[in-house]
Amino acid sequence: MSGKCATLKISGHDFGCRAVAYFHSEKGRANFTVALDDPADHSHIIAFSGEYGRRTQDDLYMLSIDRMELNSKDRPKMDGLPVPALELSDGMCRQNGNFARLEVSSITCTATDKKGRQYQLQFVSDGSPITVRRVRASAPTIRHDPYQ
């Protein structure tokens, strides 16, 4: 989604954002993921995550947040990628717009983790159509690894 973060706060600290994306897994978990504009850490990513999303109107999607996923350059890596820390949280995300029409006008998220840290996001679209990509897990296509 293209646009700008009018607000992005983590524990009272203000950040800019480089990108905002929505992910929905085949198992039902959904995330609003934000890549932070943090010159000290290009791996600084947070995700507002939950399993109970619902469309209350044609142009309003709500996601109950039950955990925050926190990633940074200091996190342990698996297959070369940082593994996020999971913080149990309570919150809500509201997306105004319609995925079917490729229109999202805004996303607002607030959450508080069990340690009392607060997370806030206010994203405003620039009006461009969103890009939708469908990614599915599949079996490996390499039958024998020649490097083993």
Residue ranges, per PLM feature:
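A mature extracytoplasmic/lumenal domain signature
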Residues: D38, Y52, R67-E69, A111-D113, ...
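C-terminal partner/receptor-binding element of secreted or periplasmic proteins
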Residues: R101-Q148
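Acidic, glycine-rich flexible loop segments
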Residues: S64-L121
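Glycine-centered flexibility motif
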Residues: G12, G91, S138-P140
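A signal for specific C-terminal beta-sheet/loop modules enriched in small/flexible residues
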Residues: A47-N71, R75, G80, V132-T141
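Short, well-ordered helical secondary-structure segments
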Residues: A21-F23, A35, G80, N96, ...
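An ectodomain-focused feature that recognizes extracytoplasmic/extracellular
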Residues: M1-M62
